[in-house]
Regions:
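Short, polar N-cap/turn motifs at the start of nucleic acid-interacting alpha helices
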Residues: 58-62, 141, 163-183
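Conserved tyrosine-mediated DNA breakage-rejoining catalytic core shared by Y-recombinases
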Residues: 52-89
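DNA/chromatin major-groove-contacting recognition/catalytic segments
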Residues: 14, 18, 81, 184-203
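C-terminal catalytic core of Y-nucleophile DNA break-rejoin enzymes
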Residues: 5-6, 75-94, 109-132
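Basic, Lys/Arg- and aromatic-enriched nucleic-acid-binding interface segment
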Residues: 2, 13-43, 47
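C-terminal catalytic core of tyrosine-transesterase DNA break-rejoin enzymes
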Residues: 38, 42, 150-173
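C-terminal secondary-structure termini that scaffold catalytic or DNA-interacting sites
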Residues: 1-10, 198-203
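Catalytic-site neighborhood detector that most strongly recognizes the C-terminal catalytic loop/helix
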Residues: 74, 171-196
Length: 203
């Protein structure tokens, strides 16, 4: 049962599209909320890790880093890890810096990547509330949470053929078993697997 509960948590593509489509990008925090969701979907960071990132964590010089080093001080289980950035994650960083600069927030090395209205770090609970309100606005299941975007990231890695050990390292799991609970096989993938057997073997 535990595997079932974990496996069912990741959102489908259509759910993410509806969620992102429900954001008012002209509202005070709309664009940041949009970028936050996309960033998690492409890095798999926990919300507590995301909200404690500084500009220096993700930027070298004037460009996004190739990867982010997550210190043991902010990770679950106090184990440091490195998470690579793909092109979409890098673009999120650029847009976040632009967002912060235009709204008068510092973009200095020690400044929060996700600042709050007090110019401090965005509280994790506030980020969760933002997603909850958005989810309710567009009529999606309560399973859509910041953590579910991490599950979405894990499933995309699995579907791309990433091996379980590498996935566990990127996600910061102590055990591959934990990573496997984050992933499940979609109906489409199961159909494709069975269809590959057609024309082979007995008929």
């Amino acid at each position: 049962m535990r595997n079932k509960l974990h496996a069912d948590k990741h959102p489908e593509d259509w759910e993410l599209k509806r969620l992102l489509g429900g954001i008012n990008l002209r509202s005070t925090w709309g664009k940041r909320t949009y970028l936050m969701i996309v960033f998690i979907c492409h890095t798999g960071l926990r919300i507590g890790e995301l909200t404690r990132l500084t500009v220096a964590d993700v930027v070298w010089g004037e460009e996004p880093r190739e990867e982010v080093f997550l210190s043991h001080r902010i990770t679950k289980g106090q184990k440091s890890r490195v998470v690579p950035f793909n092109d979409i994650a890098k673009q999120c960083v650029r847009k976040l810096l632009e967002f912060n600069r235009k709204r008068g927030f510092s973009i200095g090395p020690e400044a929060p990547l996700f600042p709050w209205k007090t110019h401090g770090f965005l509280p994790s609970r506030e980020a969760e509330r933002e997603i909850q309100k958005l989810r309710e606005k567009v009529g999606l299941s309560p399973k859509i949470t910041p953590h579910s975007f991490r599950h979405y990231f894990a499933n995309r890695m699995k579907n791309a053929g990433v091996d379980p050990f590498t996935m566990a390292v990127i996600l910061g799991h102590a055990s591959v078993d934990t990573t496997q609970m984050y992933t499940n096989t979609s109906s489409a993938n199961k159909r494709a697997a069975v269809n590959r057997l057609a024309g082979k073997g007995v008929a």
